Amino acid sequence: CRLYPDFPWLYLQTDCRNAEFVPAPDWYYNFEYAREIERGYEGHEDLLTTGYFELPFRRGRSVVFSVSVEEIADPSTLGVMFAEALAARSLKVDFLSCLRHSARQFVVRRRDGRAEVLAGYPWYGQIGRQTLVALPGIALEQGRTEDCLDVLDTVVRERRDGMFTGSFSAAEAADAPLWFFWVLQRLQRTLGEEEIWKRYGTVMKELLAAYRRGVGGVAVHDNGLVWASAPDKALTWMNAVADGVPVVSRDGYPVEINALWYNAVC
């Protein structure tokens, strides 16, 4: 089924050969989500029900039902696919195992295959500072080095004039690119200094040069410290803005940003 022509097909499949799909299409137009509206998000969408499955069932029998934007060529293999997916999951038997399981859910893949970290469910997307602060914990400490590399490589590819873009840019968060160095220091324990320099040496030099050159309201002064100031943006972690004005103005040499700068250059 497909809601609209520009939407992907949605495949509803089961491993039960005797299952019969009963069409019973119906629309729910302009379904409203009050909380989304309260938070300033788009709060209406159309919902479609296409029908239901009827199948013979008996006690002790298992039936696997799949909902996906990708068609399963042989639905009879769904039982095996489900068992394999279940076996690959981490067991949730205590607080630590639940924490590890949850950590995996924050690294997601875009349609183009690139990886990113969601800042939180259900409201947030990718945020530069949160991504880099969290990455060692949700990836490296879980033994998921490839996830860490994939996220970093996504950030690195999307830089311009030596600086990261979007919420990873110093023009949006004065400290965000500096957390990149902090992540690399932890990644070095796994890959080694030579490999880190080979993969990211040019990027590190470009970032430091961009700070010295100045990006937005952020620049290194003659005294060697990072100055951050913008009339309409909160450039530190205290980033609340009301009516276009930062709630807490921290213009100057923020201590935590300069600590990260010192860490990056030394």
PLM regions: where:
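Acidic, mature catalytic/reactive cores of soluble proteins
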Residues: 1-266
